């Protein structure tokens, strides 16, 4: 799952975590929680302080509404099972990376590789930095499956559970796994990038994990994945368009087929949240507002190559400059608010009405902030080296 969005100011929230700005695995997280002889539930409710070399913050768990576990169990048993399964494809009907790559068993393999490399020579360095960043983000798939399995009421309890939620998570992971495989092999064959530096970055990223601030809460978790899959669909679609603009129709096809997968997955996750709004509009709008106040953290925000502590920000800046990133954070939020018809709900609690007003008014507030940030960025452009392209420099 890739996501490259403009930085957004965090709006205050009594439930939000203080901003965690670590970008590098040089920053180690240490859980300093005190567990006594209290029950498991009491221990889980205790405040946990995470200490880093750049500061500390305390977690204040946002609890899902009472009965949410039962809601998710019933969703899995009832109609949502068919909804989830309908957005998966049988393995035998899925494309595989080899469908788009030179055939190693063929006598024409070397010629096919030469043709791929000839097309790749026409692509600029900044495009390859974006493509590499997308691939690295996709390759951190173990982290994303782990995150889904932290969510209460939907996690895979055995590793091979036959609940609808567990089946979905494993099948989603299996489909996503092809994305990193395909882009990795393409980049290897292109000869345009430093594969060892890329491989180091992948290892660092998986080892660092991620903190999406979903706090084991399935409401927050599926709002987060809806946002991320929408961003990923847009990103890969733009990468396909840019490849086409540079004349590489094969690479455009590769990025386009990945984008199509992401669109299916986006649809599935947004339907889950849509169903939550139908069953529990108050709890869901409160969760949406909470997630937006904390802001959506990027899956690869701890990206590091052993050299650049600001690698993710620099990669994101290049993506924004060449037009690969989603236009802004506000576009995705506005799309989801419309998709879920958040402004149409009535009969909410007082807190629910406040959350509804906050979420519906947020895109306009974000755009104003982003316009100011874009103006400042134009005045402070600089060049930085990227190890992925043999330390050649690019303008941010």
UniProtKB/Swiss-Prot annotation:
SUPFAM superfamilies: Ferritin-like
Enzymatic reactions: octadecanoyl-[ACP] + 2 reduced [2Fe-2S]-[ferredoxin] + O2 + 2 H(+) = (9Z)-octadecenoyl-[ACP] + 2 oxidized [2Fe-2S]-[ferredoxin] + 2 H2O
InterPro entries (alphabetical): FADS-2_CS, Fatty_acid_desaturase-2, Ferritin-like_SF, RNR-like
EC numbers for this chain: 1.14.19.2
Free-text remark on how the cofactor is bound: Binds 2 Fe(2+) ions per subunit.
Biological processes annotated in GO: fatty acid biosynthetic process
Cofactors required: Fe(2+)
Localization in the cell: Plastid, Chloroplast; Plastid
Family: Belongs to the fatty acid desaturase type 2 family.
Protein name: Stearoyl-[acyl-carrier-protein] 9-desaturase, chloroplastic
Organism of provenance: Linum usitatissimum (Flax)
